[in-house]
Amino acid sequence: MTLIDNQNQTMHQALINALSTSDQIDIQVGYFYFSGFELMAQHLKDKKVRILVGKQIDPNAVPNIIAMQQKTGKPVDLERFQSWDTYVSRTEQKTKYFEGFAKLFNETQVFDNPESQQAYKIFEEKIIDGSLQIKLTNSDEHGKMYLIYNKPEMNQGGDFPGTMFLGSSNFTYNGLIDQGELNSSTRDKSDFMEAKNKFEYK
């Protein structure tokens, strides 16, 4: 087991290392923001990517998020803007999630530089061709898990299906590189397959 704390090694770099022999990544996180995809875009453009998100931000909080981002010049921790309305159906919560996600895309100035514009182009192309899927989990979830699948020629006859990361990092700039986190990684086959099965039924 290897520990990743964003100090001696960042989660960003650990994911890049594991993706070098991969053709697919499954991500389950509490929060996903474009800042996370932008960091990883060049390493994900030829991969199948599935993202499960367990929490949604309140769409009404978007102006406050934008104001805070403009003030600090850095991506914002979205957890404080979580929607706490638990009396609506999960279907309505999913609608709210994508409404809030779209508002952040449309109203923040995240595409003001060539790197962001290129990352967004990759994001858009992957959504269109189906190699990027984003879904809200069926129930409220806060766990963080990254499953990186080895290519067939790299999985040693199925004995080494991939690398699993578990811990605290959301798929955001803060979670991958900027703030203290604690994640562990393992290549154990039984642990990986158990996590894969859990991901499929979320």
Language-model region placement:
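PLD/PLD-like phosphodiesterase catalytic module centered on the HKD motif
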Residues: M1-K202
